[in-house]
Amino acid sequence: MYTYSLLNLSHCRRQTRKKRKTDHTEGFLMEETKPKTVEDVETVDVYTAKGFLSTGHRYLDVRTNEEFAKSHVEEALNIPYMFKTDEGRVINPDFLSQVASVCKKDEHLIVACNAGGRGSRACVDLLNEGYDHVANMGGGYSAWVDAGFAGDKPPEDLKIACKFRPKEN
């Protein structure tokens, strides 16, 4: 039996680094937020992520459609952060607009890829876009499977909440 440490993501994220700047035309002191980096991304383990999902957080799977089709967390949103091309992997140019079409900026999101790398980079983009409650699931879907959380359902029986594909040329 596991105990879940359910923390509010807004409190466990690192403090935003801000610098002060004076608007000399109006004389107001303004705060300017630096762009977020991978160091600003909160990472949670799979047990914490599972606990968050049970309290209403959404699971954003940023793996490719092919990876997602093999197996995924039930009711996950699949919006690939990268696509495989003949030249290698390229960032999905529509990632942020696709996320915006199904997620509000104040929603709590658990972001995951296969091992954690793409997920953390996707979190950086989401944080810089104004999503305040995002966390990367450390170890990605592989860690989810290793923890024994993956179901034995065949892919066609799994519910798919959202799925995006690359644009056809």
Curated annotation (Swiss-Prot):
GO molecular function, one term: arsenate reductase (glutaredoxin) activity
Induction info: Up-regulated by arsenate and down-regulated by arsenite.
SUPFAM superfamilies the UniProt entry points to: Rhodanese/Cell cycle control phosphatase (SSF52821)
Enzyme superclass (EC): oxidoreductase
Record-annotated active site: C113 (cysteine persulfide intermediate)
Transit peptide: 1-59
Phenotype when the gene is knocked out: Reduced arsenate resistance and increased accumulation of arsenic in shoots and roots.
Keyword Mitochondrion: yes
PANTHER family linked: PROTEIN HIGH ARSENIC CONTENT 1, MITOCHONDRIAL-RELATED (PTHR44542:SF14), THIOSULFATE SULFURTRANSFERASE 18 (PTHR44542)
Protein name: Protein HIGH ARSENIC CONTENT 1, mitochondrial
Organism of derivation: Arabidopsis thaliana
Organism classification: Eukaryota, Viridiplantae, Streptophyta, Embryophyta, Tracheophyta
